[in-house]
């Protein structure tokens, strides 16, 4: 089903306000931040920062520190605003995030989610529970219309390319997905999770399909590929996490390029030498991950401030550069002093959703080298409709491969 069509049924469109963060917008006399649908109705940036600081906490979910540079994002946000961040199940899946919103007690509810686009199927649309709150960040107008709900119910944040991470001891070093059938890799290959639940492993199956004669319309060759390497003993069911890698439980994984810089740094700190390559036989770009505010968010102001931060294009200071003097600034001045989340993603190797706008404004920083698409390579990206079809096949076949 078409993502925009789902949203059109789910909610009426609203007119977005300007994208510039106001420094001096007055606080509203009786502001209910939990009902705020944009920065203006939240009382302006100074009022939002004050309210978020008063709450003092932010509940996030399934955010590994080395995922898209989220470790820096959380450190910077927490240091700047004095807000404690609680991260539930960092190595969980998009499915876990949705299930937690539906079933967790009030105190354990996440304030915000970061989920794969395929997780929206069955979550938004006619007859579905209203899991998310409508909120338009200041830069809402600059988000491509394809990747946002007209009413601000959800919006894309960043995306990446599927690549191969591997221990430097692996020989021969893999350069394409088809290489992973090599008997030399017996017991060494893993995915970052269950493709029926997580977006990254799901996209890894798509990449395997492209490398084996499939297409974004046909994920079956990818399933056949994993069935083959499972039967040969190359594929292991252990989850590809940093802890399992350091323990030697696997040596090769399919992963997003935006996780590679953080993974390599973490591996080095543990005395391991991790490498990364974009496969030459399949260059697959994921659709953007999706941000949304939980309609039952226990920290309404912190949730909205977090989203404003993630969609800021500021080039500003990192957590290491932020000073005690900076932290004493008023809310809006402090907000405009720190590096915006879109550039934090860039520094981790991700492609930010506001990239086109940032290039136009010259507000984008340089990302790390060596993790980008090879020059001249053809990039494939499955649409939301194609992912719905692909997910159904994976759900039906993966458990019995």
Residue ranges and their predicted role:
Residues 42-53, 63-84:
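Short, polar/charged alpha-helical segment
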Residues 163-170, 205-212, 286-299, 318-321, ...:
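A bilobed periplasmic-binding-protein/Venus flytrap-type ligand-binding module shared by bacterial periplasmic
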Residues 132-141, 152-155, 181, 266, ...:
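Short beta-strand->loop
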Residues 145, 159-161, 223-228, 234, ...:
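Periplasmic-binding protein-like
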Residues 18-34:
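C-terminal region of N-terminal signal peptides and the immediate post-cleavage residues
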Residues 317-401:
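C-terminal capping/gating helix-and-loop segments adjacent to ligand/active sites or protein-protein/ligand interfaces
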Residues 119-124, 252-272:
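A ligand-binding cleft/hinge motif common to bilobed small-molecule-binding domains
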Residues 59-75, 86-102, 108-249:
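Extracytoplasmic ligand-binding site segments that recognize negatively charged/polar headgroups
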């Amino acid at each position: 089903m078409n993502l925009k069509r789902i949203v059109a049924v789910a909610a009426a469109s609203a007119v977005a306000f300007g994208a510039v963060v106001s420094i001096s917008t007055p606080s509203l006399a009786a502001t209910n931040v939990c009902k705020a649908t944009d920065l203006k109705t939240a009382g302006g940036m100074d009022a939002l920062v004050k309210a978020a600081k008063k709450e003092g906490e932010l509940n996030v979910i399934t955010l590994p520190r080395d995922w898209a540079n989220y470790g820096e994002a959380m450190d910077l946000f927490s240091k700047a605003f004095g807000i404690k961040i609680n991260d539930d199940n960092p190595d969980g899946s998009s499915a876990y995030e949705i299930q937690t919103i539906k079933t967790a007690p009030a105190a354990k509810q996440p304030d915000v989610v970061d989920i794969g686009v395929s997780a929206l199927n069955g979550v938004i649309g006619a007859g579905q529970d209203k899991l998310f709150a409508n909120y338009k960040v200041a830069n809402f107008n600059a988000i491509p219309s394809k990747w946002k709900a007209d009413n601000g119910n959800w919006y894309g944040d960043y995306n990446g390319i599927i690549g191969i991470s591997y221990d430097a001891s692996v020989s021969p070093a893999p350069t394409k997905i088809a290489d992973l059938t090599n008997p030399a890799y017996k017991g060494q290959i893993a995915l970052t999770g269950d493709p029926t639940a997580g977006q990254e492993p799901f996209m890894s199956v798509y990449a395997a399909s492209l490398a084996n004669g499939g297409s974004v319309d046909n994920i079956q060759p990818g399933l056949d590929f994993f069935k083959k390497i499972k039967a040969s003993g190359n594929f292991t069911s252990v989850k590809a996490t940093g802890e399992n890698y350091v323990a030697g439980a696997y040596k090769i994984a399919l992963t997003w390029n935006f996780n590679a810089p953080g993974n390599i740094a973490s591996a080095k700190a543990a005395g391991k030498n991790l490498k990364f390559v974009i496969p030459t036989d399949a260059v697959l770009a994921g659709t953007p991950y999706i941000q949304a505010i939980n309609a039952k968010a226990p920290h309404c102001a912190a949730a909205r401030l977090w989203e404003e931060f993630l969609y800021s294009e500021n080039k500003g200071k990192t957590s290491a550069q932020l000073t005690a003097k900076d932290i004493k600034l008023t809310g809006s001045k402090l907000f405009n002093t720190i590096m915006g989340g879109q550039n934090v993603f860039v520094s981790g190797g991700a492609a930010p959703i506001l990239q086109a706008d940032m290039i136009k404004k010259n507000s984008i920083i340089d990302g790390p080298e060596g993790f980008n698409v090879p020059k001249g390579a053809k990039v494939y990206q499955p649409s939301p409709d194609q992912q719905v079809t692909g997910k159904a096949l994976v759900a039906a076949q993966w458990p019995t491969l």
